[in-house]
């Protein structure tokens, strides 16, 4: 969450428009299953992206839509629709539904996202790992390590979080993810 410094007592909560999409697709003869997070600057941007995604599949059937769309292509479509969007591979070490998943993933960010790999600025580490584990993987050195809880698991909201020292705006949040400035670390649930 964002720091609350400078907010008035009783101020309304602030939200970041986000969604998680499950991409299930074939590439190089293997079935890939990768969950990705998308952060958007506004509800209007979310509506525009929703319209484009509805043309591909049913995004209303679940709290985490499943699309037969390559993760690289979802990233491209997202950035075409909203250049200010931030795209983050989710719980990257989960065995069955993650970028580095043992049963359905890839070995590198570049293998997953190809020519758009430089548009990935952070990864969500998930419950399957902790910061010291991730710090040992040199391929992650250029990326911000993030830790989130799932809105599709309401009873578990807040069990993991990012520790930020930024202003309370979407551009400042994204800047922290992209540069690491203002990203102090993560709050981790016990393993």
Report the location of each language-model feature.
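Extended substrate/RNA-proximal surfaces in nucleic-acid metabolism proteins
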Residues: 2-121
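Glycine-enriched alpha-helix->loop->beta-strand junction motifs that scaffold or abut catalytic
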Residues: 118-121, 140-146, 163
């Amino acid at each position: 969450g964002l720091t609350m410094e400078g907010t008035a007592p009783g101020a309304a909560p602030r939200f970041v428009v986000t969604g998680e999409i499950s991409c299930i697709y074939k590439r190089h003869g293997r079935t890939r299953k990768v969950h990705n997070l998308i952060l958007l600057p506004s509800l209007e941007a979310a509506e525009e992206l929703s319209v484009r995604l509805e043309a591909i599949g049913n995004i209303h059937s679940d709290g985490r839509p499943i699309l037969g769309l390559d993760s690289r292509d979802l990233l491209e479509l997202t950035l075409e629709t909203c250049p200010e969007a931030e795209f983050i591979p989710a719980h990257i070490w989960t065995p069955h539904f993650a970028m580095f998943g043992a049963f359905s993933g890839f070995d590198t960010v570049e293998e997953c996202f190809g020519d758009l790999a430089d548009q990935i600025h952070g990864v969500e580490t998930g419950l399957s790992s902790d910061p010291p584990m991730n710090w040992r993987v040199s391929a992650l050195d250029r990326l911000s390590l993030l830790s989130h809880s799932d809105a599709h698991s309401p009873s578990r909201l807040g069990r993991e979080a990012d520790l930020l020292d930024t202003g309370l705006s979407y551009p400042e949040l994204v800047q922290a993810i992209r540069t690491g400035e203002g990203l102090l670390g993560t709050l981790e649930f016990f393993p």
